[in-house]
Amino acid sequence: MIEDKRWGGVYSFEDSPYIMEILTELRDKDTDSIKFRKGLVKLGRYMGYEITKTMDVEKVKVETPLEETEGIIVKDRRNVVIITVLRAAIPFMEGLIKVFEHARVGIVSAARGKPPKFEIEMNYIKIPQITPEDTVIVADPMIATGSTLLRVLEEVKKYGTPKRTLVVGVLAAPEGITRIKEKFPEVEIFVAKIDRELNDKGYILPGLGDAGDRAFGEPVKITTLPQVHYIE
């Protein structure tokens, strides 16, 4: 885990060969949706393991079949709220929840608009109550302009003040990190890698493309919804 000195509380896992190998497969344009989803699950899981190293632990006594010895429990692991930003974060969250199996889960549906404004539309929000003992993990694979996460973090504030708030992703652009840290300096950011920059469409370079489309397929744009008839 490497802290980036350009900001406080921003970490990458570029020193982990295995995490970098998974990221390499995700970047590959020939990686199919099945492998892409599995890669996001693996990244969520291994990044979750790394994040536990930053959490408070407690020493405990444990009885083995032979004698008593000393062990530890990761206290904060039992008080986690994972906020999932649909849709690319679904497999990523699946990996995180393998580490934080006690986590309560919130769901946010957010869509980023077109450049240059990149306005965010949020049409579904379900977040559990947040307590001062909680660590909130906002899971979003791609931290590009930061617009989506700024809106999500504003919503999270309405549900309580946690012990810590973490934004966890796969890739980030410096532009998005800067915007988040300017508005929410207390938020910690963990990503597999910080990439070079954004292009004029707001995509991360070199990036890995649209994570949602690559994981689940490109959606078909329907201008009118089909009429549904209900039978009583």
Swiss-Prot record:
Q: Which SUPFAM superfamilies match?
A: PRTase-like (SSF53271)
Q: Does the keyword Magnesium apply?
A: yes
Pathway info:
Pyrimidine metabolism; UMP biosynthesis via salvage pathway; UMP from uracil: step 1/1
Binding note for cofactor = Binds 1 Mg(2+) ion per subunit. The magnesium is bound as Mg-PRPP.
> Which InterPro entries does this UniProt record tie to the protein?
PRibTrfase_dom (IPR000836), PRTase-like (IPR029057), Upp_A (IPR034331), UPRTase/APRTase (IPR050054), Ura_phspho_trans (IPR005765)
Q: Which UniProt keywords apply?
A: Allosteric enzyme, Glycosyltransferase, GTP-binding, Magnesium, Nucleotide-binding, Transferase
Sum up the protein's function in the record's words. Catalyzes the conversion of uracil and 5-phospho-alpha-D-ribose 1-diphosphate (PRPP) to UMP and diphosphate.
Q: Name one GO biological process term.
A: uracil salvage
Question: What influences the activity of this protein, per its activity regulation comment?
Answer: Allosterically activated by GTP.
Q: What is this protein called?
A: Uracil phosphoribosyltransferase
| Binding site residues for 5-phospho-alpha-D-ribose 1-diphosphate | 87, 112, 140-148, 210
Required cofactor names: Mg(2+)
Question: What does the record give as EC number?
Answer: 2.4.2.9
Residues annotated for GTP binding in this entry? 38-42
Species of the source: Pyrococcus furiosus (strain ATCC 43587 / DSM 3638 / JCM 8422 / Vc1)
Chain coiled-coil ranges: none
Q: What reaction gets catalysed by this protein? A: UMP + diphosphate = 5-phospho-alpha-D-ribose 1-diphosphate + uracil
Q: Which GO terms describe its molecular function?
A: GTP binding; magnesium ion binding; uracil phosphoribosyltransferase activity
What family is this protein classified in?
Belongs to the UPRTase family.
- What enzyme class is recorded for this protein? transferase
Which Gene3D superfamilies does UniProt cross-reference here? 3.40.50.2020
Q: Where does uracil bind?
A: 204, 209-211
Gene that codes for this?
A: upp
Recorded superkingdom? Archaea
